[in-house]
Design a protein with these regions (language model features):
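Acidic, His/Gly-rich catalytic cores of divalent-metal-dependent hydrolytic chemistry
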Residues: 130-272
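Active-site neighborhood of divalent metal-dependent phosphoester bond hydrolases
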Residues: 43-46, 51-168
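Active-site-proximal beta-strand elements of phosphoester/diester hydrolases
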Residues: 3-10, 113-119, 238-239
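Active-site environment of divalent metal-dependent phosphoester hydrolases
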Residues: 10-14, 37-40, 65-72, 123, ...
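Divalent metal-coordination and catalytic microenvironments
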Residues: 8, 34, 63-64, 101, ...
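Generic beta-strand structural signal
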Residues: 31, 108-110, 232, 254
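N-terminal active-site segment of His-dependent metallophosphoesterases
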Residues: 1-54, 58
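Residue-level marker for buried hydrophobic side chains located in beta-strands
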Residues: 5, 29-31, 60-61, 114, ...
């Protein structure tokens, strides 16, 4: 069985269909999050990916844009300029789709590879990453009154401590798994920088290059960082190649790490 890992879709379902048509023997998919927003087919994307997951043909992680959709639907956040989520919010199957998103995992591990949307903090082992991701997953799935969503946003605490509890603990995990790009030498998350790694503030490094990264011997596949684009190293693979910004949509065949790409039309002009 061939498994293909797909970078950020962000509502670009037509581009995915074109990419999928060129993949030989595509039996199963892993989507690294950000299924929705900024592209103009978020509703179709959700419906099709949901069906694939329910038939055992895919695994879909949750990303920051997917969380944003949940927060907007709950009245916790407002739509931003450039958001393309209204068709999901107006859909007759809205509640079913939102409930499905709430139950998406924040991390996945198989065949010796760790999958996340954004990144992993330096002290976290694979086992701890999966355990912390499950803490957030369970809190989000059980958040019937949206209390967790109301407390989820914020940049603090920026550093991990095993002593963190409650919403501070969960917020730190969410930020790491769905938002982080850069870290300071002492492991603090810089959640403001969205540009390339070589444009980072002095001293900050990509999360995957932090010298104390406990997962350095484990391949980690992620999305999220479209400005950095495709990255293919032995222990880290970045797949967000900016489809929604007129870049490419990228697929990684897990078994042999072969890469497949499809050019995408420019749907947005600048990432915010």
């Amino acid at each position: 069985m061939a498994t293909y890992v797909i970078g950020d879709l962000q509502g670009c379902w037509s581009s995915f269909k074109q990419l999928a048509a060129q993949l030989p023997a595509a039996d199963r998919y892993i989507f690294v999050g950000d299924l929705v927003n900024r592209g103009f087919e978020s509703l179709a994307t959700l419906r099709h990916v949901k069906t694939r997951v329910e038939h055992g043909k895919a695994i879909a992680l949750i990303g920051n844009h997917d969380l944003h959709l949940l927060a907007v639907a709950a009245g916790v956040r407002r739509l931003k300029d450039g958001d393309t989520l209204q068709e999901v919010l107006d859909a007759p199957d809205r509640e079913e789709l939102l409930a499905w998103i709430r139950n998406r995992p924040l991390a996945h591990f198989e065949d010796g590879v760790l999958f996340v949307h954004a990144g992993v903090l330096p002290p976290w082992t694979v086992e701890q990453t999966l355990s912390l991701a499950d803490e957030v997953h369970r809190s989000l799935a059980a958040d019937d009154d949206n209390a967790f969503l109301r407390q989820m946003y914020g940049d603090e605490p920026s550093r991990w401590s095993d002593d963190l509890t409650g919403n501070d603990r969960l917020r730190c995990v969410v930020n790491a798994l769905t938002r982080v790009r850069l870290l300071s030498p002492d492991g603090a998350m810089n959640l403001k920088h969205k540009g390339k790694a070589n444009e980072a503030p002095r001293g900050d490094v990509p999360w995957f290059d932090h010298p104390q990264r406990a997962t350095r011997d484990t391949p980690v596949v992620f999305g999220h960082w479209s400005a950095e684009g495709l990255m293919a190293r032995s222990n880290v693979i970045g797949l967000d190649t900016g489809c929604v910004w007129g870049g490419k949509l990228t697929a990684l065949r897990l078994q042999d790490r072969a890469l497949f790409q499809r050019d995408c039309p420019e749907l947005q002009t600048a990432e915010e």
